[in-house]
């Protein structure tokens, strides 16, 4: 498939797009001499003409191959005497018109073009040979699959009012196939078999290429829809739907009966944001414990932060610190005396001395030797009582 040109015609005409693709050598050369191996480019032009009402309507599908005249496939609202589909062929200037109808039903555009290059070197085939080739194609066992594959391509991205018509036309075609009772034996023409298989595979691949971008767009919009609904749940907003229930079916994407049977009825679950569950749990806990949290916050706010000690108490502690700088470890009796003079409790006094020693005191070398040698505590009492007479000057605290 070299290119795809999907341009919508005027809405009043109800036409579908044009699609351009390259056919395989075998498919494009059926009915031609085997010496020609060029790759044919086939152009499909599907148009609708005429209006509704009692007068009937007609639709035309034009197909053209390189070096040949366009081949027109057309359906009109005509009725045969026996109520069966009627096929008419006009062979003027190599233009072929296929007219099909059934009793009691309004016709819908469903045509399948088999690209037949009916030129053999410089000589055209006779009308009888053309009719024989077309009859072989219609009678081929693969013909019904080819029609269904073509209709599946038409369903991809079709408007909501066209999809039901396509479904009805497909059911009518299947009913006519069953009622005709035509025996479809195994084909004995290998070239025709390969021709039918090549075009069937081409239509299947064409449908997959059409479906992929539309399906990706639908998945993206579903994810956006899910995320918007999650954001709106906090405000108790009604759920948002980007697609209506009819559009949510992707307008025929992946709706072929074969795929539905193979899928086992499973539907694709839209992707969910992994953080949505955490947010939902957070909101639930806030709603349940918001009262406790607010009361706890108020209780904590009432507690004053611990401030500095009174200035007078700090001055008394610093005076004791300067007198006992060599060994600033007050005894229990001294702590009680300091507590009475400063008005502080022993815990505050202990904390003040711990912080003061960490910040402003370092044992002298003599004191370190005394601790290492394990001297008698009576010698250490000299430092505690202030009787140690040394030349080292005291360092005043802040």
From Swiss-Prot:
GO terms for cellular component: nucleus. Its main location: nucleus. Keywords: DNA-binding, Homeobox, Nucleus. Transmembrane segments: none annotated. Residues 280-300 form the ELK domain. Residues 49-58 have a biased composition (Gly residues). It is found in: Nucleus. Residues 301-364 bind DNA. It comes from the Eukaryota. It holds the Pfam family Homeobox_KN. GO terms for molecular function: DNA binding; DNA-binding transcription factor activity, RNA polymerase II-specific. InterPro entries: ELK_dom, HD, Homeobox_CS, Homeodomain-like_sf, KN_HD, KNOX1, KNOX2, TALE_homeobox. PROSITE patterns: ELK, HOMEOBOX_1, HOMEOBOX_2. Residues 43-69, 172-192, 234-277 are annotated as: Disordered. Expressed only in the stems. Belongs to the TALE/KNOX homeobox family. Probably binds to the DNA sequence 5'-TGAC-3'. This is Homeobox protein knotted-1-like 1.
């Amino acid at each position: 498939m070299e290119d795809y040109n999907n341009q919508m015609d005027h809405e009043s005409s109800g036409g579908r797009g044009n699609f351009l693709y390259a056919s395989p050598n075998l498919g494009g050369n059926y009915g031609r001499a085997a010496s020609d191996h060029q790759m044919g480019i086939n152009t499909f032009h599907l148009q609708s003409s005429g209006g509704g009402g009692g007068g009937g309507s007609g639709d035309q599908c034009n197909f053209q191959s390189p070096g040949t005249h366009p081949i027109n496939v057309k359906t009109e609202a005509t009725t045969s005497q026996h109520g069966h589909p009627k096929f008419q062929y006009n062979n003027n200037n190599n233009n072929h018109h296929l007219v099909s109808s059934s009793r009691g039903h309004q016709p819908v555009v469903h045509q399948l073009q088999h690209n037949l290059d009916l030129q053999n070197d410089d000589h055209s085939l006779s009308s009888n040979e053309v009719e024989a080739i077309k009859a072989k194609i219609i009678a081929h066992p693969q013909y019904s699959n080819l029609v269904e594959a073509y209709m599946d391509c038409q369903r991809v991205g079709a408007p909501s009012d066209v999809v039901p018509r396509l479904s009805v036309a497909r059911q009518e075609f299947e009913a006519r196939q069953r009622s005709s009772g035509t025996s479809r034996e195994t084909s004995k023409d290998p070239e025709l078999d390969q021709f039918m298989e090549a075009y069937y595979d081409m239509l299947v691949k064409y449908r997959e290429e059409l479906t992929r971008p539309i399906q990706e767009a639908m998945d993206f919009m579903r994810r956006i829809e899910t995320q918007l609904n999650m954001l709106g749940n906090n405000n108790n907003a009604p759920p948002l739907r980007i697609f209506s229930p009819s559009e949510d079916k992707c307008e025929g994407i992946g709706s072929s009966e074969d795929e539905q049977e193979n899928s086992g009825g499973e539907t694709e679950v839209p992707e969910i944001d992994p953080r949505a569950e955490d947010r939902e749990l957070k909101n639930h806990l806030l709603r349940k414990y918001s009262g406790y949290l607010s009361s706890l916050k108020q209780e904590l706010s009432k507690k004053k932060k611990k401030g500095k000690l009174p200035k007078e108490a700090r001055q008394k502690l610093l005076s004791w610190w300067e007198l006992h700088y060599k060994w600033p470890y007050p005894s229990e009796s001294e702590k009680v005396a300091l507590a009475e003079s400063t008005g502080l409790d022993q815990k505050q006094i202990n904390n003040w001395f711990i912080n003061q020693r960490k910040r402003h005191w370092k044992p002298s070398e003599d004191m370190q030797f005394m601790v290492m040698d394990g001297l008698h505590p009576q010698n250490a009492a000299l430092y505690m009582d202030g009787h140690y007479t040394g030349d080292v000057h005291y360092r005043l605290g802040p």
